[in-house]
Amino acid sequence: MLLISNVSVVVLTKNNQNTIEKTLNSLLDFEDVVVYDNGSTDETMNIVKKFPNVNLVQGEFKGFGWTKNKAASYSKNGWIMIIDSDEVVNRDLLEYLKNKNLKDDTVYRLNSNGYYKDIQVRYSGWTLTVKRLYNKKVTSFNNNDKVHEHVLSEGLKEEVLEGSINHYSYHSISEFIIKADRYSTLFATNNVGKKSSSPTKAFFNGMYSFFRTYILKQGFRDGYVGLIIAFSHAVTNFYKYIKLYELNKELKK
């Protein structure tokens, strides 16, 4: 088997015992995989240690941007591909990478297919391209991005690679609730004192998020799953701005 030796994969983990093995099995074609764990208390690290091509690092979490840059610093290669701990790299992308001539002035996007349980979500904004492959000697993530982090690509070219990854981001409705609380808190703490908010703004942001996901992005075509996603987006955005409102009030005291 021809291994991919010029690209290092970086994966962040914390209590991902249900998904990490499937993720790492899809990365066996890479010689260098860095798993950066932030305090797992389940079987995640024991599972990770079974893979000979993985360098397991334990460290702190300071927001997604900073943490991904920190994890990338442990890689053997300049080229970094970011994969989430609930994603699977498909064979077509692996084979394409083995023959791809990567260019330093380009940030590469991956086609991402979203799944709820084992149901592919074809609408609702879940089929997209994401900036995941870059040369760390040229660019990086913004260290200040606590959530919704992205690779800085100003002044660089962007190219979508052939092939895809599957993103198994949610396996139950409870996970939507947990992530809504986590991401809304990260947003609020990252923007306290920087952005204004109000109960009215929180309400209308939530309502518009539902409309955008369910109608504009045709979430209704995903059946009941589309309804779950649309409501989750509404709740997340409502809590983002209502939490920010409360934190701003505390700041003024």
Enumerate the predicted regions with their spans:
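Active-site acidic short loop of glycosyltransferases
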Residues: 4, 29-30, 75-78, 102-103
